[in-house]
Each structure stands twice: as structure tokens, then as C-alpha cells.
Amino acid sequence: MVAVRSAHINKAGEFDPKKWIASLGISSQQSCERLAETWAYCLQQTQGHPDADLLLWRGVEMVEILSTLSMDIDTLRAALLFPLADANVVSEDVLRESVGKSIVTLIHGVRDMAAIRQLNATHNDSVSSEQVDNVRRMLLAMVDDFRCVVIKLAERIAHLREVKEAPEDERVLAAKECTNIYAPLANRLGIGQLKWELEDYCFRYLHPAEYKRIAKLLHERRLDREHYIEEFVGHLRAEMKNEGVQAEVYGRPKTYL
């Protein structure tokens, strides 16, 4: 299940950008300052917009997802700005003047990937595995920068979170698209962390009864299991180091699939 993030909330229950940026684990002070400037720019551009809160929230979610993958600061800034560009709150030309060409190039690459919706058959069940694989290959061929694909995966996860309370047909449509295209794409790229979260949400939306049944059988919450694994991995690493064994040790909780 999805980890609950609260590091960016202050005592009054309000969003605290300084606290949020500090929680992302960005080592460079300059990078933190640039992200703070980008956040301020997003606030300015969305002022008075009816969907301001939603667009800002979506960008925050995407940045948090990408920060767990230790993506560079340009990727994080592009992710924060992407919802605004995608909703045409601010044009790419204006962004190019404000934040630079490199970030706009990333945003443009992510937006180009939306064209794939015209090629996949998530509205029905007639799509073949060969067609789906062709779509995935096309996605990879459409972008010149790997970071665009990773941002798109983060955007799809944010979307799946967003439609949690939406009508069933909207949830199912989003889940089918991610099941057919984006979860396998994350797997092909070796980004297991994003693949597991995509699959968790898709299973929840496509098979709600089974999801609830399995969830009920799991006595440990995912966060508890993650904490247990972290402790176990730490202990195992220490023991292996004491024995002079050089090895990489890692673990993860199983998903519901």
C-alpha cells in the first residue's frame, strides 16, 4: 500500500514548503533553493485558478515520488511544473523564459507521451498483448530523455491516487491503461518501486473485492512490514560486515498481486 506522507505538514495542518523540501533528502542547498523558487513560481501562476489546489498537490505528489528515486533537480522541478503546463495554466514559451530550456524540454517530452492514448485500447478488452507491447516500444521511442518516462510514470501514480474517490468507470479506465502500458513499462525499465505502486492501485481498482479480501488477511500494515524489513536488512548488513562479507542486501514488502 501507499506510504502516508506527512513530513510537509506543519502543526496547523497547513502545507509547509520549507519543511517539505527538507524532507526530500536533497543534499545540495542550491538545489533546495531552486526547488523553492519553482514552488513560489507555481503559487504565483496558479493564483486565482479554480483548480489551483489540485494542480499544486499533483506536482507535490510527483516530486515526492521522484525524490525516492534520487532524481536530479531539473527532473524534480519539471515534475512540479508539469501539471501547470499540462492544464495550460502557463505555456511552454512562457516557461522557457522563466525556468529555462532544459526543464521545458523535459515537460514537452512528458506531454508528448499523452498521444499514446490514441493508440491503446483501454476503453475495451480487445487489445492484444502484441499491440500493448508495440505501444510500450513506441512510448520509449517517442522520448529522447529517459527522465521524461520516469516523470510520466510518477504522473500516472499521482493520477491513480487522485481518482481513488472518482466514479468506478473512471478508476477502471485509469487502471486498465496503467496495467497495459505503464506498469510493464516501469518493469522493463527496472524501476520496481514505481511498478509495485502502479500494480497495487490497478489491482485495487480492477478487483476491489479480491483486494479487500487479501487486505483483510494481512495482519501487518505495509508500513509495519517496511519497518521490519529495514531493521532486518540493517541487522543482516551489520552481521555480514562483521564477517568480512561484501554484499548488497535489500528487501521489499510483497504487493497484493
Q: At which residue positions do the language-model features occur?
A:
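Active-site helical microenvironments for divalent-metal-assisted chemistry
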Residues: M1-L257
